[in-house]
Amino acid sequence: MAPPSVFSEVPQAQPVLVFKLTADFREDPDPRKVNLGVGAYRTDDCHPWVLPVVKKVEQKIANDNSLNHEYLPILGLAEFRSCASRLALGDDSPALKEKRVGGVQSLGGTGALRIGADFLARWYNGTNNKNTPVYVSSPTWENHNAVFSAAGFKDIRSYRYWDAEKRGLDLQGFLNDLENAPEFSIIVLHACAHNPTGTDPTPEQWKQIASVMKHRFLFPFFDSAYQGFASGNLERDAWAIRYFVSEGFEFFCAQSFSKNFGLYNERVGNLTVVGKEPESILRVLSQMEKIVRITWSNPPAQGARIVADTLSNPELFEEWKGNVKTMADRILTMRSELRARLEALKTPGTWNHITDQIGMFSYTGLNPKQVEYLINEKHIYLLPSGRINVSGLTTKNLDYVATSIHEAITKIQ
């Protein structure tokens, strides 16, 4: 008699919610269906958009006979790493001028977070510091908790961020939680376009956050997934990161080029490391090289080449900025239009938070029962938290979505 499968005791894992939502949407035959759950940009025709500048650079790469498919270095394409870090920190960054910046090409923003988390678990402020508290915002992107847990961190906590009652930032709660955090705790910060709330601190509020973090010796780990995509302005979206440099912080910054280049399936990311002196950066990168070697060994080239070629060419860079602004402007327009329709319908509650928020996502304030109603009765797909992808709205479905939200709120408490 053959023994049972060695996999017979493996439990079925829960599906990843946002991808399950998209699968359900695809299978729904209803012609009215709207997908507000997907974490990717859509045009006004509800299609993915390949940026014109990306098409141009892809053609240029395809025609370059000097290129081949040899392995990239373990830390990635050098031109990409330097261009990516420069984009985050700015051309005039004192950290760049003083050569105390390093970069690691990664598999998207998630890969950058994981390499950073693995390094911190091994080497942060000593060795083997898996008991160091890691703070993430409440709420945050669900992968933040999972990545730091998988890296071995045992004490993951949340800091207050979203005030559900006023539908905005709970600054005082945020600052109080930072004040009470043990010294040298790791704080995960959203650089701009906070996911899922779309609510960002103002520059003045960032200054207060930095002040508390400085005197409590807290370590910032920025997640920058939307630079340029949030406001349409690269500098504005990197303001917090650059301010922390000016205040003398050492920090990590996980960068993603999925959204602002539309390179979702190329997995293009970078981990920017800012230290106090060049020597420590070299040592940090030497250890990160060891971590990358046992994780993916060498990163893929295509997406990194597209980004590096674009950022290093003044003409292509300007064209890319225009493409990014096109996406950001469409999202801003959809925010205004949705708010105007809800207010015209006299939908209960206030709706200014929709236009106060920024970036791809909006935290609507809808509760799980109202979300369930929208999915089951109206075929409008969104997360149970009430988060919507604003770029899923179009001139063709806005009226339907607004009246459906109005109906959900007036019918379901």
Curated annotation (Swiss-Prot):
Residues where Phosphoserine is found: S149
EC code: 2.6.1.1, 2.6.1.3
Keyword terms: Amino-acid biosynthesis, Aminotransferase, Cytoplasm, Phosphoprotein, Pyridoxal phosphate, Transferase
InterPro entries attached to this UniProt entry: Aminotransferase_I/II_large (IPR004839), Asp_trans (IPR000796), NHTrfase_class1_PyrdxlP-BS (IPR004838), PyrdxlP-dep_Trfase (IPR015424), PyrdxlP-dep_Trfase_major (IPR015421), PyrdxlP-dep_Trfase_small (IPR015422)
Cofactors (names): pyridoxal 5'-phosphate
GO terms for MF: L-aspartate:2-oxoglutarate aminotransferase activity; L-cysteine transaminase activity; pyridoxal phosphate binding
Similarity section: Belongs to the class-I pyridoxal-phosphate-dependent aminotransferase family.
Role summary: Biosynthesis of L-glutamate from L-aspartate or L-cysteine. Important regulator of levels of glutamate, the major excitatory neurotransmitter of the vertebrate central nervous system. Acts as a scavenger of glutamate in brain neuroprotection. The aspartate aminotransferase activity is involved in hepatic glucose synthesis during development and in adipocyte glyceroneogenesis. Using L-cysteine as substrate, regulates levels of mercaptopyruvate, an important source of hydrogen sulfide. Mercaptopyruvate is converted into H(2)S via the action of 3-mercaptopyruvate sulfurtransferase (3MST).
Anything else known: In eukaryotes there are cytoplasmic, mitochondrial and chloroplastic isozymes.
UniProt subunit comment: Homodimer.
PANTHER family recorded: ASPARTATE AMINOTRANSFERASE (PTHR11879), ASPARTATE AMINOTRANSFERASE, CYTOPLASMIC (PTHR11879:SF3)
Protein name: Aspartate aminotransferase, cytoplasmic
Organism encoding this protein: Macaca fascicularis
